[in-house]
Structure formats: structure tokens, C-alpha cells
């Protein structure tokens, strides 16, 4: 009996003893635990290409290769850090975003995490044909960049402000907003509450013909601050906190405390006119998502009350900025899959479905029938 018990205990605890005793490259440490050594392996950075026959994938942080869906064999190389032209070089990339026309690639480097879904990084524009690199911006690290549908512009956020880079004008940079301030005003990027509760980061979008840009503005100036200590022994090491712990403060509203005041704004890229969209919203209401439809004059806006039991979908013209409600109804008071809304633009296989209807419409994911279903509204 004792032998059987010992055998069972050995089987149960031997993996734990092995893991706690030795990591892959030596004794178990804080660095090995937090550095990804024990993460599950997977396939990342796979992006289907326009030909429908192949896909691109980042390999070893240095190359973006093209492979065949049918055979899995490599058929080409889109980017090789060791084989570029010009003076600007990068030795390693953390990720990439292909332009819609696949002529350029945004290369992500020097990535730094902020919260669960947000990062800052230094991005470079890579010209596939010329094999040349150019920095997206010289003004500091960027957040949540987005290609325009025509592939000729890139929008991004830096320090709470929204910027636009025009590739056809020698990468000229336009600052759209100027009121961004840490722990006060954020343009085009979700605050902590929205990032955590609605699983969103980027809060701006281009319209289909790349003439307008819309974004959500978060005023968190009245949200209470939360502070937690920062120690030297954290990873990465904070030597400045060797003798006394430092502190990090950010806006964190507990139940009953004020949320950010949110509003929707548009920017006419040609005239540079900025407008506020007149969205009917409760004082403590949310705007979890905005997105342009395949019609460049229709901006979809999702709103929700703070109790999260009622949601509405509005459609607005980005220039007159008037809204009309096209869907209203009860919602689950929780977000089971955290995204529960699905705005579809003219891309991928959904483009064929929308074209087949020959009318304006959008897809909406909802639990209103007690089972998660996708609805098409027109």
C-alpha cells in the first residue's frame, strides 16, 4: 500500500519538481518565468496574401517569408534584415503589418508593453520593391498604427495624440490632435478601462476611400488615480528604485467612480477640418467601438450604458456629423467573449456577402437569442 502511495505521489509531483528545480538554461528564476521560456509554442504572424495561394510569416525575427498554402513550402522572401538597401537598417523586428496593396510593410521594433493589449514601438516603413527602410516618425515611439485602405497613409498615436503620415508626400507627418496628455486626455487609443473590459486598443479608423479619419477621445481627467509600488527587483530591473520603491500611477475607476468622458471626432484629410459627431450618450455611457462601413459616408458607432444592459448602434455621416440609431436593445450585462460586436468593412470573404446583398449593411454579433449568433442588418 505504501509503495502504491509513493508511486502515485511520484507521478503527480515529478513534473512540478522538474519544473521548479531546473529551467531550460539553468535554475528556475524570475526571468525564466516572466521571459516566456515556459510559454506554449504556437504559430504566429501568419498573414494570407492577396493572391489567395500563399501566406507570409515572420521567421526568427529577421525575415518575412512567403509560403504556399497547398504545399507549405517557402516560395519567396518579402523582407530580410540582412538584405536591405539604403542607410537605414534594422537588425531584428518584433512584428509587421502589411499595407492593403502589399507594396509596403510596417516593421515593428523595440516593442515595450504598457497594459494587457497595448504597446509602444519604433516602426519602420519598408518598401518591398526597392528594399529600402524609412522611419515611420522621428518624434518618438508610436502606438497602434493603421494603414489607410489605399495603402498611402498610416495613422498612429503618440503620447495621447493622433498623427497621420502621408507616403505620397515624402512621409510628411500631420498632427491631428494636440490636447493629448498622460492621465488626462487620450485621442485614438483606449484608456485602461476600455482596453481591459472591451479588449480594444486602437480607437480610430479610416473610411473606405481614405478621405476621412474618425476617432474616440477619452477625457479621463476626473477619473481617480491608482498607485502601485515599483521595486528594483522587477523585470526589467529598476535600478533607480534600489533604496526606495518608486510608484506608477494610472487612472483606475472602481465601481461608482467616474469613467472617462468619451466623444467621437472626425478629420477631413484634404481640408484638415475637425468635427465632433453628435452621439446621444448617457453621462456615464460607453463607446466601445467605432468603425467605418464599406460606404465611406457611413460611420458605425456602438454605445452602451454604464450598467451594460442596453446597447445601441448608430450610423453617422462623418461630415454633417448627425447620427441616427439603427439598432437598440437589451444586452447581456457582461461581455462573454469581450468583443461581442463585429463591424465588417470591405475586406476578405465578407466583402462578397455584402456585395451580394447590393445594399448597405453590417454584421453584428449578439447573444440576444440566448445563443451567440451573427446578424446582418441593412
Language model feature labels by segment:
Residues 30, 34-35, 77-89, 174-196, ...:
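Surface-exposed loop and turn segments in beta-propeller and other repeat-based domains
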Residues 116-164, 169-203:
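Asp-box/WD-like beta-propeller blade repeats and closely related beta-sheet repeat scaffolds
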Residues 46-53, 59, 96-104, 145-153, ...:
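Blade-terminus and WD-like Trp-Asp/Gly-His loop motifs, strongest in beta-propeller folds
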Residues 347-378:
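N-terminal low-complexity segments that are often proline-rich with Ser/Thr-Pro
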Residues 61-66, 115-122, 159-165, 222-228, ...:
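Structural motif
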Residues 69-72, 127-131, 167-170, 268-272, ...:
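Short loop/turn segments that connect beta-strands within beta-propeller blades
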Residues 110-115, 119-122, 176-204, 212-276:
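Predominantly five- to eight-bladed beta-propeller fold
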Amino acid at each position: 500500500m505504501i509503495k502504491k502511495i509513493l508511486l502515485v505521489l511520484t507521478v503527480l509531483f515529478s513534473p512540478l519538481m522538474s519544473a521548479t528545480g531546473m529551467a531550460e538554461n539553468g535554475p528556475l528564476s524570475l526571468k525564466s518565468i516572466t521571459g516566456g521560456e515556459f510559454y506554449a509554442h504556437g504559430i504566429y504572424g501568419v498573414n494570407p496574401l492577396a493572391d489567395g495561394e500563399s501566406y507570409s510569416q515572420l521567421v526568427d525575427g529577421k525575415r518575412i517569408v512567403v509560403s504556399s498554402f497547398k504545399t507549405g513550402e517557402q516560395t519567396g522572401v518579402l523582407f530580410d534584415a540582412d538584405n536591405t538597401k539604403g542607410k537605414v537598417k534594422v537588425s531584428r523586428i518584433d512584428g509587421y503589418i502589411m499595407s492593403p496593396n502589399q507594396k509596403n510593410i510596417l516593421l515593428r521594433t523595440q516593442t515595450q508593453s504598457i497594459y494587457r493589449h497595448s504597446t509602444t514601438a519604433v516602426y519602420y516603413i519598408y518598401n518591398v520593391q526597392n528594399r529600402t527602410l524609412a522611419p515611420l516618425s522621428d518624434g518618438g515611439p508610436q502606438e497602434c498604427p493603421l494603414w489607410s485602405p489605399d495603402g498611402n497613409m498610416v495613422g498612429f498615436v503618440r503620447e495621447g495624440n493622433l498623427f497621420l503620415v502621408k507616403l505620397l508626400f515624402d512621409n510628411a507627418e500631420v498632427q491631428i490632435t494636440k490636447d493629448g496628455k498622460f492621465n488626462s486626455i487620450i485621442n485614438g487609443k483606449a484608456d485602461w478601462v476600455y482596453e481591459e473590459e472591451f479588449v480594444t486598443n486602437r480607437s480610430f479608423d479610416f473610411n473606405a476611400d481614405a478621405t476621412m479619419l474618425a476617432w474616440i477621445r477619452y477625457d479621463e481627467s476626473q477619473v481617480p488615480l491608482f498607485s502601485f509600488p515599483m521595486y528594483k527587483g522587477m523585470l526589467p530591473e529598476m535600478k533607480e528604485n534600489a533604496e526606495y520603491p518608486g510608484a506608477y500611477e494610472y487612472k483606475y475607476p472602481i465601481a461608482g467612480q467616474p469613467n472617462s468622458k468619451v466623444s467621437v471626432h472626425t478629420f477631413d484629410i484634404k481640408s484638415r477640418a475637425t468635427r465632433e459627431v453628435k452621439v446621444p450618450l448617457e453621462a456615464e455611457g460607453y463607446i466601445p467601438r467605432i468603425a467605418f462601413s464599406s460606404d465611406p459616408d457611413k460611420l458605425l458607432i456602438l454605445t452602451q450604458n454604464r450598467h451594460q444592459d442596453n446597447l445601441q448602434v448608430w450610423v453617422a455621416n462623418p461630415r454633417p456629423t448627425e447620427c441616427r440609431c439603427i439598432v437598440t436593445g437589451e444586452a447581456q450585462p457582461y461581455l462573454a467573449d469581450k468583443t461581442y460586436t463585429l463591424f465588417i468593412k470591405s475586406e476578405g470573404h465578407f466583402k462578397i456577402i455584402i456585395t451580394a446583398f447590393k445594399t448597405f449593411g453590417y454584421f453584428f454579433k449578439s447573444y440576444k437569442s440566448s445563443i451567440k449568433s451573427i446578424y446582418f442588418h441593412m
